[in-house]
Swiss-Prot record:
The gene is anmK. It comes from Shewanella frigidimarina (strain NCIMB 400). This is Anhydro-N-acetylmuramic acid kinase. Its EC number is 2.7.1.170. Belongs to the anhydro-N-acetylmuramic acid kinase family. The keyword Kinase applies.
C-alpha cells in the first residue's frame, strides 16, 4: 500500500457560515476524505468581516487586525480537525488555505482580489507549512482569479461520454461545464447562491439560514420583482466572469426592494430563492439543453432550492456530488487541499478558458512552519 499523502484544505466562502477544514489523502487515483470539521466564526469576528467587505474608514488598521484573527481561527480549525484523527501535524505535507475574501474586484483597470487570514500565523500555530494566496497569480495573468474549483472538478468528476455540470452553491453560485468530449471545460460564477436568502432571513427572523428553504416555500414569488432582480447587468455578461459581495449584497437588495415594501416577507424570500434558481438555470440551459447536474456546497442541502432548480432544467438528471462519491458539503474544502497538492508537485491549477488568464500557472505561495 502506498504511503499516505496528507494535505489539509481550509475554506471560508462569501456566506461566512464557518471555516470548513478537511484532511485528504492524495496517494490514490482519487482523493480520499479522511476527516472533516467546521469551525464556527465568532459573532464579533463575523461582524468585523462583514463590515470590512464594504468600503469604510480606518480600513487598514481593521484589515491588519482581522488578518491575524482570521489566521488564528483557521489554525484553530486545523488543530480541532487533527484532534478528531490519529494523524499528527508532522504527517501532513501542507495546508491549502483559501483565506477569507474581503474584496474581489478583477474588472478594474488594475484588477485585484484580497483574501485575509495570515498564512504565517496558521503555519506557526499548527506547525504545518501553509500554501495560500491562490488567486492573485491568475489575476496577474489577466484572469479573474475565480472560479478556481473547475480544474479540480475536471480531474475528479469528468467522465468521457457524459455531459456534466458541477454546480457549487455557496454565498455565490458557480458552475463547471464538463462536456464529456474534446470540447473545452468552462466555468464561471452565475450570481447569488445563498448570500441573499441568508441575509434576508438573518435580518428578519434572526436565523442564520433558511433551513430546507421552508420559509421561502411558505411564500409566493412576485414575478415583477423577480424580473427586476434578473435584469442586473451581471447576468447578461459574457463569461469568463466572477462576482461576489461587491455586487450582490444587502445594500443592493434594499435598493431593489424599495418599491416592494408592501410584500409579505416570505414572498420576498421566495422571490430571492427563485433569483438564485433562475440565474443558475438560465446559464446551465445555455451551455447545453441536457445532461447531468451534480450540486455541491451549502445550497445542495436546501430542499426547496434543489426542487425548484430541477424544474427549471428539465433536460438534466439532478443529484448532489455525493452520488459521485464526494460529499457535497466538503467539495470546496477538498478542492483547496488539491490546490495545495498541485503547488507541492509544481503542477498548474488554473484553467485559462475559465478564468481568462493568458496561460496556466502554478498557483499560490508556500509559508513554512519552521
Amino acid at each position: 500500500m502506498s504511503k499516505p499523502e496528507y494535505f489539509i484544505g481550509l475554506m471560508s466562502g462569501t456566506s461566512m457560515d464557518g471555516v470548513d477544514a478537511v484532511l485528504v489523502d492524495f496517494s490514490a487515483e482519487h482523493p480520499v476524505l479522511i476527516a472533516s470539521h467546521t469551525e464556527a466564526i465568532p459573532a464579533h469576528l463575523l461582524k468585523g468581516l462583514q463590515r470590512l467587505c464594504q468600503p469604510e474608514t480606518d480600513e487598514i488598521n481593521r484589515l491588519g487586525r482581522l488578518d491575524r484573527s482570521v489566521g488564528k481561527l483557521f489554525a484553530q480549525a486545523v488543530n480541532h480537525l487533527l484532534a478528531k484523527t490519529t494523524v499528527t501535524a508532522a504527517e501532513v505535507i501542507a495546508i491549502g488555505s483559501h483565506g477569507q475574501t474581503v474584496r474581489h474586484m478583477p474588472n478594474l483597470e488594475m484588477g485585484f482580489t484580497l483574501q485575509i487570514g495570515d498564512p504565517n500565523t496558521i503555519a506557526i500555530e499548527t506547525n504545518i507549512d501553509v500554501i495560500a494566496d491562490f488567486r492573485r497569480k491568475d489575476i496577474a495573468l489577466g484572469g479573474q482569479g475565480a472560479p478556481l474549483v473547475p480544474a479540480f472538478h475536471q480531474q475528479v468528476f469528468a467522465q468521457p461520454g457524459h455531459s456534466r455540470v458541477i454546480l457549487n452553491i455557496g454565498g455565490i453560485a458557480n458552475i463547471t461545464y464538463l462536456p464529456g468530449n474534446s470540447e473545452q471545460v468552462l466555468g464561471f460564477d452565475t450570481g447569488p447562491g445563498n448570500n441573499l436568502i441568508d441575509a434576508f432571513i438573518q435580518q428578519n427572523l434572526n436565523q442564520p439560514f433558511d433551513e430546507d428553504g421552508a420559509w421561502a416555500d411558505s411564500g409566493t414569488t412576485h414575478p415583477d420583482l423577480l424580473k427586476q432582480l434578473l435584469s442586473h447587468s451581471y447576468f447578461s455578461l459574457a463569461y469568463p466572469k466572477s462576482t461576489g459581495r461587491e455586487l450582490f449584497n444587502r445594500a443592493w437588495l434594499e435598493q431593489q426592494l424599495a418599491d416592494y415594501s408592501h410584500l409579505d416577507q416570505q414572498d420576498i424570500q421566495s422571490t430571492l430563492l427563485d433569483l438564485t434558481c433562475h440565474s443558475i438555470a438560465n446559464d446551465i440551459n445555455k451551455l447545453s439543453p441536457n445532461g447531468e447536474l451534480f450540486v455541491c456546497g451549502g445550497g445542495a442541502l436546501n430542499k426547496a432550492l434543489m426542487q425548484r432548480l430541477a424544474t427549471l432544467v428539465p433536460g438534466y438528471k439532478v443529484d448532489t456530488t455525493s452520488a459521485l462519491g464526494v460529499d457535497a458539503k466538503w467539495v470546496e474544502g477538498i478542492a483547496f487541499a488539491w490546490l495545495a497538492m498541485r503547488y507541492h508537485h509544481d503542477l498548474p491549477a488554473n484553467l485559462p478558458a475559465v478564468t481568462g488568464a493568458s496561460r496556466t500557472a502554478i498557483l499560490g505561495g508556500r509559508f513554512k512552519a519552521r
